Structures are given as C-alpha cells and as structure tokens.
C-alpha cells in the first residue's frame, strides 16, 4: 500500500517517517495539512498537534479514533466502518483507491 501511494500523483510530495525518531518527526507533522498512515503513535501525535489524520484501521478498535473529529478512518474492504478489532488482521484488504479518495477529500 505504501509503495502504491509513494508512486501515485498524491505521493510525489510525501515521505515516510520509517527511519526517523519521533522527535525528528514533530516539526514535519506540525506543518502538514494531513497525516496518512496506519493507527500508530504518529497519527495520534498529528491529532495532538491539530493536524487532520487519515488513519488506516487494519485491526484497531473504533475507540482508538473516537476521541477527535480530526480523525477519519479507512477500514479493510468487507469490514463495516467502526467494526475493526484486534483480530481483524486486515492489512492486505485495505484499498489503495479508498485511501487515496479519502485523502483527496480531506485536503480539498
């Protein structure tokens, strides 16, 4: 999914935090219009910094996103919104097109 995004038109102005420390990511996150990623600490940090977050919920319960209106979620295909659990294990069922579509809605 990440490689599809990086190679898309939307991905040309994005980069991954995979080799950065949390502290190194803070100024980048704060200056973003939108955070896109799975339900991890970086998404929650983005929300704490008042940045909209599109969180990919592969196997995270809805309660992890319900605390802020800045969070929009994408669930695996075939899973009803808000019905993911720790046992969903849906990372291979997340639609790139759905993530891209939701991303474009949130930045426009």
Q: Over which residues does each language-model region extend?
A:
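Donor-binding and catalytic core of enzymes assembling or modifying cell-surface/extracellular glycoconjugates
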Residues: 1-58
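Nucleotide-sugar donor-binding patch of glycosyltransferase catalytic domains
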Residues: 44-107
């Amino acid at each position: 999914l990440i490689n599809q995004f990086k190679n898309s038109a939307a991905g040309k102005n994005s980069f991954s935090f995979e080799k950065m420390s949390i502290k190194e990511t803070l100024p980048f996150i704060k200056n973003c219009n939108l955070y896109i990623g799975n339900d991890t600490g970086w998404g929650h940090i983005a929300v704490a910094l008042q940045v909209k977050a599109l969180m990919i919920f592969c196997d995270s319960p809805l309660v992890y996103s319900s605390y802020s209106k800045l969070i929009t979620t994408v669930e695996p295909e075939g899973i009803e919104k808000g019905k993911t659990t720790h046992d969903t294990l849906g990372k291979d069922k997340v639609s790139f097109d759905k993530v891209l579509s939701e991303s474009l809605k949130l930045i426009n």
